[in-house]
Amino acid sequence: MLLKNCRIVGTTDIIEGDILINGEKIVGIGSKFSDTDEIDIKKNYVIPGLVDIHVHMRDFKNKRKEDFYSGSRAAIAGGVTTFIDMPNSNPPVTDIKTYNNRLRLASQKSIADFGLNFGVTKDNQKSEIEVEPMAYKIYMDNTLGEIDEKTIEETIRLRHSVAIHAEEPRLFIGNKRPASAEVTAVKKIAALANKYKKKVHICHVSSQNSLNFFNKYISSEVTPHHLLLTEKLLKEFRGFAKTHPPLRRAKDTKALWHGLKNGDIQVISSDHAPHEIKDKEGNLDESLGGMSNLDVMLK
């Protein structure tokens, strides 16, 4: 296949040319190729496929919201060719059997490349040795059940790749999740990463003060909604603007943009988490957190 008249986006510049494809591989970029199967791109941009490292596909018991097939179609439509699925499904991916079942299901349904994370609990630290997830995911907010500090520390000490939802639940005020809950958790994780000289990834950072505790062992991501939206939207859109962690102040979004530009934050990820309308309307405290944005993140 030959893609003609492309504007090809590279790491440092944009060039015009044609792209020759053989099977699933690009075998040439230039202007002197020929092929019986041609597509005229008409000077539109061609970019590498995005890798979204934070996605919540709803397959298993919540597949009415989305399954691996519909979710991966949304990914491809949005320019995402690889996604990493989070383990807080129903049932959660916290044991070998469920991990293998989800791997099989995604392999059958997904039209995009994918990887799976494995959920850490205080009871499964020995059982997951046989799997090779993209990362071991810790939910400090007790999404997968209450987790103790010993489990968190041992996971960071022993595992090759650890991703963390950093919010300290003891600082929650009812259903509200203040920025201090995230900052306290990030400070704790950064200290453990430095103690064991181990890389740790902080998911969906939302507060400007969290950035103050990053060190050379911390990588992090930010979502489009935390870059572009603020807590003022909660008054008008209520549950439809509810996320975990919550939308913050305008000065937080400004700090996150600065962190992205200076390299403190290395990744933009969608934190795609679709729900049915009934899950988002009504009382803000009772509505479910999450936004469906896998197919629009690049836009």
Residue ranges of model-derived segments:
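Gly/Ser/Thr-rich active-site loops/lids in small-molecule metabolic enzymes
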Residues: 286-299
